[in-house]
Amino acid sequence: MIIMIRKKRFLRVAGVLTAALVLGAGIFTAAGVLQEKSLNTAADGNWGLSFQEAGKPPVANASMDYLKKFDAYYAEDTDKKELFLTFDAGYENGHTAKILDTLKKHNVKATFFVVGNFIETSPDLVKRMVKEGHLVGNHTFTHPDMSEIATEEAFRQELSKLEDLYEKTTGKKMKKYYRPPQGKYSESNLKMAKEMGYHTIFWSLAYVDWYESDQPTREEALEKMVPRIHPGAIVLLHSTSVTNAQVLDELLTKWEEKGYSFKRVDQLT
């Protein structure tokens, strides 16, 4: 069976469940509608993955070669056992410090994609990320559906406002790595990000971890995240997940036992 993961809005006001389960050749959505889904290269839409073989990169709805035209990535094309651990941080609910403690214990440098609310409410955590050698990336200022933003001015404003807030908070320029909120994108978005000097970073491994009131169990997390790891994986976790905070030590250990090392996404380019 093929499994597809789609990242949706993870803020406290998160609405309808939109994670999809693939059944046979189609997708069963929360709305109960069976839809056919092509996994060929796509210029617009929601980021989607099809996991077909353990230990191998999934098939995505845009190819590595297509994305590279826009300085964008969902995985590194490599046989080396290295992975790029990333966290999306839309708000702080008490778990980020524990995640940072665990990363420090393993001497792992990760990438945190933050939004404006996170920097405004948790500046000390952002400063700690920087101090401890993590990369802080741009997840936009307000976490909108960027695929619906058609003008370059509006697109630039979402990224530039976060850049300014980050620099005001840390005294440092933000490195230009961008993750589209909810994994929603368009080809024009990719072009605009590239024109701003940004690399767009999708992911090749994730699971449904962003619902505060419906967290996966330890067993579910390990079942999803350990066997599907692959060389060059860009892993997406949410810092709002209590399960992630609790299981991260074990997860890192299991990946290390498989021979994996860890890199920041700025080592992709």
Spans of model-derived segments:
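N-terminal pre-catalytic segment of deacetylase/amide-hydrolase enzymes
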Residues: 2-86, 92-98, 105, 220, ...
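Catalytic grooves of carbohydrate-active enzymes
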Residues: 230-266
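Active-site beta-loop-alpha junctions enriched in small/polar residues
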Residues: 90, 115-117, 141, 181-183, ...
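Active-site beta->alpha N-cap acidic-glycine motif
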Residues: 49-150, 161-167, 174-175, 269
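Alpha-helical scaffold elements lining the catalytic groove of polysaccharide deacetylases
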Residues: 62, 95, 144-170, 184-231, ...
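A short acidic, amphipathic alpha-helical/loop segment
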Residues: 98-99, 124-128, 189-192, 247-251
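Structural recognition of the beta-strand scaffold that forms the well-ordered cores
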Residues: 83-86, 110-114, 135-138, 176-180, ...
